[in-house]
A protein has these predicted regions:
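Conserved donor-nucleotide binding/catalytic region of nucleotide-linked donor-dependent transferases
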Residues: 317-334
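Short, hydrophobic alpha-helical segments
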Residues: 316-320, 352-358
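Nucleotide-sugar donor-binding catalytic core of glycosyltransferases
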Residues: 1-295, 336, 341, 345-356
Length: 358
């Protein structure tokens, strides 16, 4: 029996594989349960590293699911799942850190390319890299080839945004954290009745980099407090279930944490499609080659206009129910097609286990 350790799940105690874990919102941990089950079929036993340490078992390999300092263990290979960009996790752009691993699983097509002139690619050329798409979990209420709340009926929320109030950790024009805030502020000022914000951390302003950013943060926090107003008036609290919220919404702003990074496609667009909600997407530069363009609204069509959110709002407001259903139908067809399979939990497990066993 081959034994592997999981490093980076702060709860430890195999909580990563527990469907009843309080962190398992919308069953987001399913990919790791599938990974464990598929590993067992291949004679591999997976546990979080703390469990192995308590039982005195030395793993043959460790799989890092967060970018943490490498733990040296004799005769143990180490693999990294590089989930985030270096804008959010700066160490993911550190060649010295990446080169410590025996292999890196990543969606980053630039890093995966053998002919890229990218500096990080060249500095890590000797480290094996394996393609891995961000996994997406089908909600329990989702049924293949069916659309929940077809059309406008049952969708009392016009437009929503679900996400945590975070910021980039490196200055970079590609970050979209601040663009989310622009969208929120526009709707709050111009169409407050047609917008709702969900997620964590929105009772305070968005944090910013640098000294001037810190002063701006303090002012944006203090002034609403003194005036007895909410920092973000559209905030409705955390979404206990994204599917429950999105199945009641017509549109959802689905911006990645950063744009124009090839391969960087996370759960945001898929969460909306599962719920029959039309995504307003910005992020992966080649998204139309991955997800059919009739499934979503590409915000790049509006971004260079003089008033992008006004034009977007007019487009959304004038959309007929027939056109809305066409978006829903296109999303349904994509999710039922082979094109979605690379983004499933099963594909995630197979993409990891193949290289580990080779």
């Amino acid at each position: 029996m081959v034994v592997g350790g999981i490093v980076g799940w702060e709860e430890g105690q195999d909580d990563l594989f527990n469907p009843l874990s309080p962190r398992n919102r919308d069953d987001c941990l399913e990919p790791f349960r599938v990974l464990r089950a598929k590993a067992a079929e291949r004679g591999i036993e997976l546990h979080t590293l703390d469990v192995l340490e308590k039982t005195g078992i030395t793993p043959q390999f460790n799989l890092y699911i967060e970018s943490l300092p490498l733990i040296p263990i004799n005769n143990c290979k180490n693999y990294l799942i590089r989930f985030e960009t270096d804008l959010t996790v700066p160490i993911n752009g550190d060649a010295d850190y990446l080169n410590q691993f025996d292999g890196i699983f990543t969606w980053d097509t630039v890093l995966l390319s053998k002919n890229s002139e990218n500096a990080l690619n060249q500095k890590t050329a000797s480290t094996p890299k394996f393609p891995l798409a961000y996994p997406n979990v089908l909600p329990a209420a989702f049924q293949l080839n069916q659309i929940v709340n077809l059309g406008f009926a049952g969708r009392d929320l016009f437009c929503v945004l679900i996400g945590s109030n975070r910021h980039a950790n490196l200055p970079d024009a590609r970050e979209l954290y601040s663009e989310r805030v622009k969208a929120i502020r526009w709707f709050e000022a111009n169409a407050p009745g047609d917008f709702a914000l969900f997620g964590n951390g929105w009772r305070v302003p968005q944090k910013r980099l640098g000294k001037s950013g810190k002063w701006r943060y303090r002012l944006e926090k203090v002034i609403p407090f003194l005036m007895g107003k909410a920092v973000f008036p559209s905030y409705r609290g955390a979404a206990k279930s994204k599917f429950a919220v999105l199945s009641k919404a017509r549109f959802c702003i689905c911006y990645e944490n950063a744009r124009d990074i090839p391969g960087y496609l996370t759960e945001k667009l898929f969460d909306a499609l599962f719920a029959g909600c039309v995504p307003i997407y910005w992020g992966e530069p080649n998204i139309q080659e991955i997800v059919p363009s009739n499934c979503f609204i590409d915000f790049r069509q509006f971004v260079n206009r003089s008033n992008p959110y006004q034009d977007l709002y007019q487009y959304l407001s004038k959309m007929t129910e027939e056109d809305f259903i066409a978006y829903q139908e296109a999303g349904k067809q994509f999710l039922a097609s082979p094109a979605f399979r690379p983004f499933s939990s099963e594909a995630f497990a197979q993409a990891i286990l193949g290289p580990i066993q080779s």
